[in-house]
Regions:
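A charge-rich, low-complexity, intrinsically flexible signal that marks solvent-exposed coils, linkers
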Residues: 1-29
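C-terminal structural segments of small proteins and small subunits
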Residues: 57-78
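A short, structured beta-strand/loop element
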Residues: 32-56, 60
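Low-complexity, intrinsically disordered short peptide segments enriched in small/polar/basic residues
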Residues: 15, 51-52, 66-69
């Protein structure tokens, strides 16, 4: 669980510098399953019914939008 804790702490400190792979890893640790890949959006579903859609950065952007990172952090609090 050390990697999960480090990812959460990094997201809290600097939400503007989080890559999509890190968001995907944290959602996987929390039990979210990728169920829809359409274009630049990835949708995740949790067994308890929670849904989450994350926009994959493209072009020159390397990191996820801070709003998406905050949305993931809010889902972790529940």
């Amino acid at each position: 669980m050390a990697r999960r804790e480090k990812l959460l702490e990094k997201m809290r400190r600097t939400p503007a510098k989080i890559r999509f792979a890190e968001v995907h890893a944290l959602l996987s640790y929390e039990g979210f399953v990728l169920f829809n890949k359409r274009g630049s959006h990835r949708s995740y579903h949790h067994a308890d019914g929670r849904l989450m859609t994350i926009v994959v950065p493209h072009g020159r952007h390397k990191t996820c939008h801070p709003t998406d990172v905050r949305k993931v952090l809010e889902a972790m609090r529940r």
